[in-house]
Amino acid sequence: MGNTFGHLFRITTFGESHGGGVGVIIDGCPPRLDLSESDIQGDLDRRRPGQSKITTPRKETDTCEIISGVFQGKTLGTPIAILVRNKDARSQDYNEMSVKFRPSHADATYEAKYGIRNWQGGGRSSARETIGRVAAGAIAKKILKQVANVEIVGYVKRIKDLEGNVNPDTVTLEEVESNIVRCPDADMAEKMIDLIDQTRRDKDSIGGVVECVARYVPRGLGEPVFDKLEADLAKAVMSLPASKGFEIGSGFAGTLLTGSEHNDEFYIDDNGNIRTKTNRSGGIQGGISNGEHIIIRVAFKPTATIGKEQKTVTSESEETTLAAKGRHDPCVLSRAVPMVEAMVALVLCDHLLRWQGQCQVLT
């Protein structure tokens, strides 16, 4: 249970961190979409470990294989299966964690729920599970771009107390990818990199915020009342490992304003379209996209697995200490960027298909 996401564009991820591989089954992809591994590999490369000194040193190529659902370079409309094989697992690094629970990790709760857990690399709770999401998200991005010209760009907004100055209306993928921390503010990016590197040397971890903008989203996406667009976006990104908070538009800061200050006033643009002068709603009103840019923020906690000694307990309820071994991210933010983009793309693609299926039948 809990491994499937979406309605019409539906994905099921599978695999564990130290198993034979990880992947995804995608059901509901429209037929006749041009698709090859190269359409997917770019985003997987952005997500993969071992990219730089501020990520885990685990070395994986994360090479994807499409094993069903595509024929002669086009989707068939049948389930698409994508597999990425694990190549560099070092399970012996986790021997101590077979009995000791990592503080603030999923170890203890998985044990409590299932009565058994895969302690090698965290199993299903590992961020390696997100490979399937990113692969499926790459396909969703391609559909959104081809059908509606939607652009999705994520970036690191904040690391600990260091916050970048980024304009979501104009930021480009090239600017995001110009440095290893994926913060388009070049000056702040250098400070972020230094902070993460120092944290790594201290055997500790830090968190931060990823911001993501979806531009040119058509008006009308969202299914009130329980499947409002922002509700599905919140569920999507809050299902990512280490996520702890969600905001859209003005977010919590909007509570400091009055209605007259917060309302996005309407006007008619030169093309006769209804637009808003401001975008404090974040592109969604009443749970439905309004045609403005959708802007969300996701908070990620500091990585739970750290090399500093901490107090914990064993599966036999004995108090002990743990200084985790193995290879872990001192900060997940730079690798979380393509994960957030993927989840946003999956939600928007699913809602685009739902909108067309319901609202475009009778024109």
Curated annotation (Swiss-Prot):
| Alphabetical list of InterPro entries matching this protein | Chorismate_synth, Chorismate_synth_AroC_sf, Chorismate_synthase_CS
The residues that cross the membrane are none
Q: Which cofactor does it need?
A: FMNH2
Example GO molecular function = chorismate synthase activity
* EC class of the enzyme, as a word: lyase
Which Gene3D superfamilies has this protein been placed in?
Chorismate synthase AroC
Residues engaged in binding NADP(+): 47
**Cofactor annotation comment:** Reduced FMN (FMNH(2)).
Tell me which Gene Ontology terms the entry assigns under biological process: amino acid biosynthetic process; aromatic amino acid family biosynthetic process; chorismate biosynthetic process
Gene Ontology terms: cellular component:
cytosol
What quaternary arrangement does the UniProt entry report? Answer: Homotetramer.
Which family does this protein fall into? Belongs to the chorismate synthase family.
User: Per its database record, what is this protein's job?
Assistant: This reaction introduces a second double bond into the aromatic ring system.
Name-wise, this protein is Chorismate synthase
Native organism is: Crocosphaera subtropica (strain ATCC 51142 / BH68)
Gene responsible for this protein? aroC
